[in-house]
Amino acid sequence: MSRNFELLQQAGLNLTATVEMPPTLERELGARVKKENGGSRAFAADLDRTAKEETLKLVQSVFLLQGTSTNHRAVVFAAIDSGSGCSRVCVHAAQMLAANVSGSVCLVDANFRTPSLPNAFGTTNHYGLADALRTEKPLRGFVKALDRNLWLVSCGSAGEASTNLLHSEQMKRRFGELRKEFDYVLIDAPPLNTYSEGFALGQLADGLVLVLEANATRRETATKVTERLNATEVKILGAVLNKRTFPIPDSLYRRL
């Protein structure tokens, strides 16, 4: 049994998907962000075939095969540690979901300390969630259209001092508005091992997708975070093993 899957098993997690981002592609995306002066549209087409398949599997498992009576789903994406690629997983899941459903999909950047979703789409970060939490203006005024059925609420005028807003009663009200306005809501949250916002947001959502970094996330840390999620009654809808690399050709690996 590999170290990665042993980690998942001992932490009591069921693997939903493994997402590989080839180093060459990651460098290309980074270069494109700089070239386009701070923005890059990280479309799902940027993923290789295997990553697309895994992202589709994640979307089907979490959003489309739950057997619920309604399509309204609100899910938090949160990594255990920083630097695990959670925002990228969340972005590609939203794009894949929007491409496979007729309903509306909304991405929400709730990572106030290190927001990244606007950069992924080459749009601005101003006038977003933090601003919406300070006013009673209609939520639609803080939403940016990205595609036919894909929308974004950036973090807005946020910062370290604004994180308490994510624990507020106004956040509960805004979350309710998001559910009414959109068929699917995907929230990118801060890492769970360092900050508490992901737990609070998970309690408002239908559940949480946990993102782990292959060969980096420690078993003890994963277990501690999982236990706290259970204690706070946050449902874990899936676990994603990100940044996994294949030392042998993928076509051969998948036959093993």
Where are these regions (language model features)?
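P-loop NTP-binding module
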Residues: M1-L256
